[in-house]
Amino acid sequence: MTVTEHRPWRGVLVATALPFDEDLRVDHGRYAEHCAWLVENGCDGVVPNGSLGEYQVLTPEERAKVVETAVAAVGGARVMPGVAAYGSAEARRWAEQARDAGCASVMLLPPNAYRADERSVLAHYAEVAKAGVPIVAYNNPIDTKVDLVPELLARLHAEGHIHAVKEFSGDVRRAYRIAELAPELDLLIGADDVLLELALAGAKGWVAGYPNALPRESVRLYRAAVSGDLDTAKESYSQLHPLLRWDSRVEFVQAIKLSMDVVGRHGGPVRPPRVPLLPEQEAAVRAATEKAVAAGWA
């Protein structure tokens, strides 16, 4: 089966939160259980070592073991690790590690140690593509200051470096331009709070944050949206949006982990330099999550 036929990045892939114990050590047992629980509750796969997974504060040994833990829990076909790094050679090594662990695809940010120009972006993706594992580009110009605009995405796709893009710019208009320039490039919803808009624009998947806490309702929302069941999708989306919008805020990791705690999962602490939510932030997240629980969505 070809990469184009398989497309393992389609569907609901959860950018997994990473559990730490009280001493801030990675709890691999809890992480394995969490990955399995997400799949059991309808999610199509997991994305370890993304921003939500706090990969920036992991040691290389921890980061590698997180991938191996996810693969052991749900199988490599369901695992798409983030392989971001400051250098192209290091990112390629992470892609090779994912490949050797059995992962079917990887997710890659552009260079983000500085504001890379187009030639640097092309060279970066070309180098990591040498690992031989399909790449999903991750466009997050808000945090990286490097914007994978539709024209650049089309070129990356035409040169065979990427097969899909996680689109986190917040500009839903881009979906239509991407479809015009690169119709075979899969668009993945990259921010929870534009899910409905991008689903209607033809998205093929969702790299998601809030299913960490509410997988069944999140999957129901996604399936309704992409199938055109707008009555179901709009009602669910409107009710969940007070939570979903936290995925686009600076405190998204803390918010999603708190929601996990509220619904009875283990979200737990974050590693520094992240700090706990302010009292008013915690109250808002807790209230919105408790409302979702009362509605039977957890």
Task: Give short role names for the model-derived ranges.
Residues V71, R92, E96-R99, Y176, ...:
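Residues within alpha-helical segments
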Residues V14, P48, G53-Q56, A85, ...:
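Short, flexible micro-motifs
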Residues T2-K145, R155, A298:
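Active-site beta->alpha loop and helix N-cap motifs at the rims of alpha/beta catalytic domains
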Residues A72-A77, D100-G102, A131-V133, H157-H161, ...:
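Short helix-capping segments at alpha-helix termini
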